[in-house]
């Protein structure tokens, strides 16, 4: 699946976003095979098997939310290598 925000930008690991009004960061994107360096291959395989498609968000308060695809409450803010 081609993961994109409703605004059309591709979803990538490290993106800064707003989800339900709360700041968050995209931790990984299964569909693009984008993972943090410290995530084991075993963990990656489990995510692929359990979820198949989607991405994980981590909010500033530490809460993690898995989404199978973008929804109307998810807004792109900036790429990881750009200033917010």
Residue ranges and their predicted role:
Residues 22-37:
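Short beta-strand-centered aromatic/proline hotspots
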Residues 42-43:
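Terminal, intrinsically disordered low-complexity segments enriched in charged/polar
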Residues 48-84:
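Intrinsically disordered, low-complexity, charged/polar segments
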Residues 7, 20-22, 60:
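Short strand-coil-strand connectors
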Residues 1-13:
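Mixed-charge, Lys/Arg-rich low-complexity intrinsically disordered regions
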